[in-house]
Amino acid sequence: VNSAIEVYFDNYLILDKEYSSTNTRNEDSITITKNTIILNNNNDSTMTLANYFLHGEHIIKAKLYFVNSGEKGNGTDFIEKEIVILDRSSKTPLIWTGDFKTEYYTYETIRIPFRVYDPNVTIAKVNLYKNGVLLSTREIAD
């Protein structure tokens, strides 16, 4: 029984790698650039992330599997991380969130960490709405 990993940039598969069960130290790393090849793209090995590696928020996610006789078994839940690619020539503001829970108890304070980048101003104004009702306003210094 071996182990395997799949890594996605947004929803594009960019790594599908199997590790031998005899290797007890399965550490690896991947560098994602606009030249990273998209796998399983109708056998077109020239398709890269160039058209998708753009200014904005993106999701990188990975999933681990056990592999038995070449067949992947059930995998773990995805491990996801939100990233931002910043193109300083773009004038488009960006807002991205950090890790937060999707369910809360009634008595809990809802905490949603976020970052703001607005190349047009030195202090960005952010309004938080719930069901169309303004809850709060914050000013974020760059």
Tell what function each PLM region has.
Residues 1, 112-118:
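Aromatic/hydrophobic beta-strand junction motif of beta-rich domains
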Residues 89-98:
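Proline-enriched interdomain boundary motifs that mark the N-terminal boundary
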